[in-house]
């Protein structure tokens, strides 16, 4: 069953409050990011933790416990995953974790963004862009590099509701617009 947005937010808020209270925010940022990535496109795993009888339910909960405790995930996160399995709501896990991740980053005054380029950027380039954008938005910025061959050249950065477009495509469009007026 897919949960409503408010219920997803409630789960995320509960986990966020635990992270703050237990002083685990930094750990949760790392662990939640890893969970989001590891559960991407894992329909087989969702099927493993779906059940139709008590024995399968016990197995599903054991799978969660064994899988995630072996990687050192926090017990509160594991228990939340087990609750989702028990209530047959595991399919909502990534949505809950994404909301939680945003709350954790906001708490640390960090924002997520994307930098679009025609080819993969080096770590040095990415760090230089992060620094420049961080200064513009007055927050620490974490960027994900996404490839967009339509840009022709240059980069486009999207952070919060702001877009910083230094691509050749944008410059050509601006020039075209200027010529039409």
From Swiss-Prot:
It is a peripheral membrane protein. GO terms for molecular function: proton-transporting ATP synthase activity, rotational mechanism. It is found in: Cell membrane. InterPro entries: ATP_synth_OSCP/delta_N_sf, ATPase_OSCP/dsu. GO terms for cellular component: plasma membrane; proton-transporting ATP synthase complex. Belongs to the ATPase delta chain family. This is ATP synthase subunit delta. It comes from Mycoplasma mycoides subsp. mycoides SC (strain CCUG 32753 / NCTC 10114 / PG1).
């Amino acid at each position: 069953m897919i949960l409503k947005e408010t219920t997803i937010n409630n789960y995320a808020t509960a986990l966020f409050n635990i992270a703050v209270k237990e002083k685990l925010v930094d750990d949760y940022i790392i662990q939640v990011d890893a969970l989001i990535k590891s559960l991407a496109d894992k329909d087989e795993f969702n099927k493993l933790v779906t059940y139709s009888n008590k024995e399968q339910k016990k197995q599903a909960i054991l799978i969660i416990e064994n899988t995630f405790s072996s990687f050192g995930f926090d017990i509160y996160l594991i228990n939340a995953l087990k609750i989702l399995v028990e209530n047959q709501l595991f399919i909502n896990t990534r949505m809950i974790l994404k909301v939680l991740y945003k709350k954790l980053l906001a708490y640390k005054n960090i924002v997520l963004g994307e930098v679009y380029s025609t080819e993969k950027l080096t770590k040095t380039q990415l760090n230089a862009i992060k620094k420049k954008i961080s200064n513009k938005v007055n927050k620490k910025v974490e960027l994900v590099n996404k490839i967009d061959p339509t840009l022709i050249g240059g980069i486009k950065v999207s952070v919060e509701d702001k877009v910083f477009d230094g691509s050749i495509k944008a410059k050509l469009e601006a020039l075209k617009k200027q010529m039409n007026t």
